Amino acid sequence: DKGDYGPYRQSSRADIYHIYAKKLVLDGRAYPVFSTDEQLDAIKAADKKTELKNTDWEKEAEARHEAMLKRREFTIEQVEKELAAGHAFALFAIADGDPSKRIKVTDLIRGDLEIPECDEDVVLLKSDGIPTYHFAHAVDDHLMRTTHVIRGEEWLPSLATHLMLFRYLGFKAPKYMHIAQLMKLCEDGSKKKLSKRDMGANMDDYKRLGYAPECVIEYVMTLLNSNYEEWHAQNPDKAYTDFPFNIKKMSNSGCLFDMEKLGDVSRNVISKFTADEVYNGLLEWADEFDADFASRLKAAPDRAKAVISIGRGGKKPRKDYGTWLELRDYMALFYDETFRIIDALPDNFNKNDIIKTLDAFAASYDH
């Protein structure tokens, strides 16, 4: 592991987590629960199912609170007996919050917020000794000198828990930015969160389809800051790195991920590339995804660049392809191995007339 704050693999940091876990136990801030991870997951799953069916939220919260208090009821003798028997345990943090009280916190995107104090015990270490995100976040981000945490808004409900853990450990909490979720447009016109299984959520999708990194970055910039498009229109020759990015310009509501707009942005970006830049990007993509096409490009690079140069440059450069995949299909016309007649001539055409017509066209075509 390179860097000043390694090791970076969670499995290699077990001793570090356990040291801080012992501190919390000694401080009376944590306690063991002798249940397997499967049993804990079953409890969580049952809670979720109950929440979906039960509309009496107050009663449900009371039941969970009573179950939590019951978990805290144990003696040292009981713990020693469980340990002597070799039983595994999960380690819980004891929440000291009052849900009727509020914590004032500043989110760098959302401004000043008031959130309920944490009143639910949370798992710090699972029964295999591996920390949960809650605990690893506090320990790792402190030891690695993290000053700003940027994460999705789905973590806002956990913010009180994390602030509590930083306080328990005696650490200074970082500054937080909770960004809005990416949304996708459904067929019925509604919007929902972009899932990791949706097209566009995985960077491998962009590589496979042949989007140039510059195009994806350009599009993402339009999502990050509301004034980027206006700035870019006024500064068409400047790089995105020159843009005065402003956290306060980030949206609080979910922005819509639009593949069609990505295509428009990509076509515009590629239209400004030189033939050499297009060739290099196309070849890099073909080397990974289409070996035969890559071989044709390498065999005659000047010919490939000549094809790429068609309609490139000038005041109105061509904008009919936005990915290397689309460009490959376009270039198929110029290679014998991939040339295909899409619309064959009707059978009733006289062959001699066809030959005469083609000869006349070839003679008049100024290429």
Model-derived regions: residue spans:
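Non-transmembrane alpha-helical segments in soluble domains
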Residues: 18-25, 217-220
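Short, charged/polar micro-motifs that form catalytic or ligand-binding hotspots
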Residues: 7-10, 152, 206, 252
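Hydrophobic (often cysteine-bearing) scaffold residues that line and stabilize catalytic clefts
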Residues: 13, 17, 158, 212
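Catalytic adenosine-cofactor/nucleotide-binding cores of aminoacyl-tRNA synthetases and other
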Residues: 169-365
